[in-house]
Regions:
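Formylglycine-dependent sulfatase
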Residues: 2-464, 469, 473-475, 480-554
Length: 554
């Protein structure tokens, strides 16, 4: 299917979705509903954006800096520790331990976005929105997990971490296993009203979507292959802009989730951006890659202006997880402790910039606690349905499915418009399926130590660490290994002794959260690279088999 044929296949679905304006929706004109553009970079370092680092870094990001000047910059914005979890966090508004999307998704894995999970796209489609997703997905590669059966009208992109797409091009990759364990190719898909029963090997039933295979994604241009990592972002951005144009032509407000490849490893720059690294500016590959990210943001902002809709469009720029610094200089920079994959601030606290003229105060800084979870109810409020949280708690039909879910996000409309404080007081830091830390207002209680970072051992000390993130945002203080009071660490020992009483708040918070899991159980067991859970399950099944065998022999 040619890209221009979206009008033939996609607008049929868009027109049909106009009938789904129930569940608190209204039939307001499209120009009264804000368009929503959510740009989610990959592994972006907070300090690699000029608006945050204030010139401390060599690179420049003029478009992102302008966006911050015209909108709001967040200092206490939280994603998740890894990409799958961070993307599920945003699109479902639920903690990843509810959806089971807790760690990096692998090719052919049985775990993906559950059918029971309601997405922002599904809820916005019920409000009359055209919904498109372009670029990285990483929420499962089987057909049942694709975006176009989870509320999106159109999807183009890839389904894993970027380097997974590069695996088959390594000289030692066993090509005879490519169709057994290899990554799925780039996908272009469209939602349809027809349920296609066709079963695809490895990927399952097609369902209510049309799917095209757009080929592999090699690191560099290759004869006979359509796309490559050097320039794939050009197509991701172009398709995103084309979708906006088509939605406007159909008089539809649009929600577009843009997911460029940068700055995930391995960074393969086009000649244009590779040439930006020179002896005059001292740039590394990270600065050159961030220049590409910034140009992409500039292209989106200029296109919205050319369309005449920039003043009625919510634009958010953020990233999926804490920056990945262990492959530096092909890695980002953060002022916070540790990086991606840990429960330290560097694993969760990420950049976020919001622009919405006439609603979000220009050149403002938001110091309240925010989470990627919060966009679901906030966007729905902006779209005309402020009741989505209560509706999902009770059960609501959206499209052809009834959902009953516990949103963990808060409606932050008052905070982003300057009319009140953040509605959020807590952050749960998930180390895959384990709660590794909790933040309650200014205080963080950490139960896991990861001194070697994501790739190292997780220690579970008997005594957790308490940090006041307003006094020590970079988590510089802690106990010395020999538990003696030495130097600056003396403050931590005395201070900790007089703050220990605060753990009662953690107990209360955890008790309250556990109750929600009793009423709204997890949809599936979360994935993990730790085999302990799998070994325990295998042992339990072996015990069941032995018991059954004994019973049969009696």
């Amino acid at each position: 299917m040619k890209r221009s044929n979206f009008i033939k296949y996609g607008l049929t679905v868009l027109t049909a979705s106009a009938a789904l304006l129930g569940a608190g929706g209204t039939a307001r004109a499209a120009d009264r509903k804000p368009n929503i553009v959510f740009i989610m970079g990959d592994d972006i370092g907070m300090w690699n954006i000029g608006a945050y680092s204030r010139g401390m870094m060599a690179g420049t990001t003029p478009n992102l800096d302008r966006m911050a000047k015209e909108g709001m910059l967040f200092t206490d914005y939280y994603a998740e520790a890894s990409c799958t979890a961070g993307r599920a966090n945003f699109i479902t508004g639920e903690l990843p331990i509810r959806t089971g999307m807790t760690t990096v998704g692998q090719a052919g894995a049985a775990i993906g976005l559950p059918a029971e999970a309601c997405t922002i796209a599904t809820a916005l489609k019920a409000q009359g929105y055209a919904t498109g997703q372009f670029g990285k997905n990483h929420l499962g590669d089987k057909n049942e997990f694709l975006p176009t059966v989870h509320g999106f009208d159109e999807f183009f992109g890839y389904l894993y971490h970027l380097d997974a797409m590069e695996d088959p091009f390594h000289p030692n990759y066993p090509q005879n296993l490519l169709n057994v364990v290899g990554p799925r190719n780039l996908i272009h898909s469209w939602a349809t009203d027809t349920d296609d029963p066709t079963e695809m090997p490895r990927w399952g039933k097609i369902g209510k979507q049309k799917i095209e295979d757009d080929g592999p994604l090699p690191p560099h241009p290759m004869a006979g292959i359509k796309y490559n990592m050097e320039t794939i972002d050009d197509t991701i951005i172009a398709d995103s802009l084309a979708f906006m144009d088509q939605a406007k032509a159909a008089n539809k407000p649009f929600f577009v989730w843009i997911n460029p490849t940068r700055m995930h490893v391995v960074t393969h720059l086009s000649p244009k951006y590779a040439a930006m690294m020179n002896s005059q500016n001292g740039w590394s590959i990270e600065e050159a890659g961030m220049a590409e990210v910034d140009d992409e943001v500039g292209s989106v902002m200029q296109h919205l202006k050319d369309m005449g809709v920039d003043d009625n469009t919510i634009v958010v720029f953020t990233t999926d997880n804490g920056t990945e610094s262990f492959t530096w200089p092909d890695g980002g920079t953060t002022p916070f402790a540790q990086c991606k994959g840990t429960v330290m601030e560097g694993g969760f606290r990420v950049p976020c910039i919001l622009r919405w003229p006439g609603h979000v105060p220009a050149d403002s800084v938001q110091n309240g606690i925010f989470s990627g979870l919060d966009w679901f109810p906030t966007f729905l409020n902006a779209a005309g349905n402020p009741n989505i949280t209560d509706q999902l708690l009770k059960g609501v039909t959206l499209g052809d499915r009834t959902y009953k879910n516990h949103l963990d996000g808060y409606d932050q409309m008052a905070a982003i418009t300057g009319n009140g404080p953040s509605a959020r007081h807590e952050i749960f830091y998930l180390g895959e399926s384990t709660i590794g830390a909790v933040r309650i207002d200014d205080y963080k209680y950490r139960f896991i130590d990861q001194p070697q970072g994501w790739l190292g051992v997780k220690n579970h000390p008997d005594v957790p660490t308490i940090t006041n993130l307003r006094l020590d945002p970079f988590e510089r203080l802690g106990f010395p290994e020999d538990m003696t009071k030495q130097g600056s660490l003396m403050f931590m020992g005395d201070w900790y002794m007089y703050q220990f009483w605060r753990f009662v708040f953690v107990q209360q918070m955890m008790g309250k959260e556990i109750q929600t899991f009793l009423a709204y159980p997890p949809m599936q067991r979360g994935a993990s690279f730790n085999l302990d859970a799998l070994k325990a399950e295998m042992a339990a099944k072996m015990a069941q088999a032995e018991a059954a065998a004994k019973g049969a022999g009696q």
